[in-house]
Amino acid sequence: MRLDAEVSFDLKELFGVDKPAVAMAHLPPMPGTPLYDETAGPAAIVESVARDVEHLVGAGFDAILFCNEGDRPYQLQASLEGVAMMARVVAEVAPSDRPFGVDYLWDPQAALAVAAVTGASFIREVATGAYESDMGLWAPDAGKLLRYRRELDAEHVAVFMNITPEFASTVGTRDIATTARSVRVSSLADAILVSGPMAGAEPSVDAVREAKRGCGDETPVFANTGVKSSNVKDFLAVADGAVVGSDLKVDGGTWNPVDPERASRFMTEVRAVRESL
């Protein structure tokens, strides 16, 4: 538990390496959502994610991040059946030999609840700021989230905060460096994430650099979307780690299954970066 906002979160203690690569395990549409395949049922969701996780672990990713990417259009409050389905998937297929995390689009408390009961090490969420978004006006509450973490006795679950969320734009005027520093200090982020405008869309390297300037060495910064085998070297030259999803999929499509060859190619590039450190 962080008692002092100036105490750096130990990224290497969690992931075991410098410049960790976190791979997305995207859940297909879950029960109750518009694209859910009720004929295939919940078992098909578990089987799909299990196959992807097997490929990602085989490629050597340092951690797996489970996310309900298939639940379009997204909502700001999770459904009971969605939380139950995600908890089932994570409990059944999470790897036992490396860290894993949870991201519930776009409900931080739901992500934390699933993480707490499944043994996850971290969550990724938008927890601060105010936005105009595809889901309407959006104003998450970091204070509520971290108090809920205390209620659950889940302070071992790190909170990675995305400060430039996909499918949204901020209504504020602060620059990225100022925002990153403020979120680090006032909202006690364990890590800061910088995203592009949509899933699979890359942020600028300069945006990641600015977030890092705001955080210094106190809080790690991740490139959160759009990282590819072709650009991961550029991002990891600035960022402390990377989250990747779309580039690992068949034809680079966000909602496609994982392509083992693309996953292996990505990790080959990451290892080359580490060897150059």
Q: What is each PLM-predicted segment?
A:
Residues 27-33, 114-191:
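Conserved anion-binding
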Residues 26-50, 100-107, 161-177, 222-228:
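Active-site mouth loops of central-metabolism enzymes
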